[in-house]
Regions:
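Catalytic loop of short-chain dehydrogenase/reductase
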Residues: 144-166, 171-180, 193, 253
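C-terminal substrate-recognition "lid" of short-chain dehydrogenase/reductases
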Residues: 125, 220-249, 254
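Conserved glycine-rich cofactor-binding loop
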Residues: 16, 23-25
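Alpha-helical segment proximal to the catalytic Tyr-Lys
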Residues: 133, 176-180, 240
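Short, small/polar-rich loop/turn modules that mediate ligand/substrate recognition or access, typified
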Residues: 94, 179, 184, 242-244
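Substrate-binding pocket helix/loop in short-chain dehydrogenase/reductase
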Residues: 104-105, 112-117, 212
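A glycine/serine/threonine-rich, flexible loop-to-helix segment
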Residues: 5, 180, 190-215, 256-286
Length: 286
């Protein structure tokens, strides 16, 4: 059963697109949609086994995998060179890899802080820079960075909030500095998404993850497909005049978080979009 994309077949025919963190969650879902739309895919991440499983799901044809620590400049260069040796070009890049853990600022060690900043901000910089220098500076392309909402602070994840703020500012800056090369760069800012990553959070966070939908105007969690669709749009020719934006896909949570004066009534009028036949609801939300 193939991915049920809302975009036209063959949209990315002849294009090579890199997806970091492509072995699970949002990266896996995005990879499936891009493959359905004709892209040649390069999946890059830390764990080869995860990448290989997704490659098997997609079919071996036109799929390349490369395991690398994206916080390491030498490994990033090797990964980009590997993709170019395989595919000969890089038309699109999805910086989806990341990682964090819940903790209050007073409890975060320097090593923990540095690890989260490196996972979510430094890796985005390194991969984007090397893709730009090795291909896009002379050939153009599109980059989408997957982030998180940080504008109102991120209590319980201050390290992640700081990193994501820097990641979005990098998007804004690069969209100006690299525009002359025909490179567009944008961010997608997911809200609370029912992705497999939720199951990695400790049990003490489960009630918050389940109950947060009460604060979301659409009164539900988002789906992986709803994030993938935003990424696909920003990579596509339809977004040819779109650069330097942070596109929120959060069911209205950000705007509602600015005010405590209005309580959205409970409802079930927001119907989710799910085009991914292999998607499963995280256990924590069952």
């Amino acid at each position: 059963m193939s991915y049920r994309s809302v975009f036209r077949p063959g949209l990315f025919e002849g294009q090579t697109i890199v997806v970091t963190g492509g072995g699970s969650g949002l990266g896996r879902c995005t990879a499936h949609e891009l493959k359905t739309l004709g892209a040649r895919l390069a999946l890059v991440g830390r764990t080869q086994d995860k990448l290989d499983r997704v490659k098997e799901e997609l079919g071996d044809k036109d799929v390349f995998t490369f395991a690398a620590d994206l916080r390491d400049e030498i490994q990033v260069r090797a990964a980009v060179d590997g993709v170019l040796a395989w595919g000969g070009r890089i038309d699109g890049l999805v910086n989806n890899a990341g990682g964090q853990f819940p903790a209050q600022l007073k409890d975060i060690s320097l090593n923990g802080w540095n690890a989260v900043v490196a996972n979510n901000m430094t890796a985005t910089f390194l991969v984007s820079k090397e893709v730009y220098l090795r291909w896009m500076e002379n050939n153009g392309g599109a980059i989408v960075n997957v982030g998180a909402d940080w504008e109102l602070g991120m209590p319980g994840m201050g390290h992640n909030g700081a990193a994501r703020a820097g990641q979005v500012n990098f998007t804004y800056t690069a969209s100006i500095e690299w525009a002359h090369a025909g490179v567009r760069i944008n961010s997608v800012i997911p809200g609370f998404i029912a992705s497999s990553g939720l199951d990695r959070y400790p049990e003490r966070a489960h009630d918050v993850l389940r109950n947060v939908k009460g604060r979301i105007p659409m009164k539900r969690h988002g789906t992986e497909s709803e994030i993938a669709g935003a990424i696909v749009y920003l990579l596509s020719e339809a977004a040819a005049y779109v650069t330097g934006i942070a596109l929120r896909v959060d069911g209205g949570l950000h705007n509602n978080g600015k005010s405590n004066f209005y309580e959205v009534p409970d409802h079930d009028r927001s119907k989710p979009y799910n085009g991914f036949p292999l998607y499963r609801i995280p256990k924590v939300l069952e």
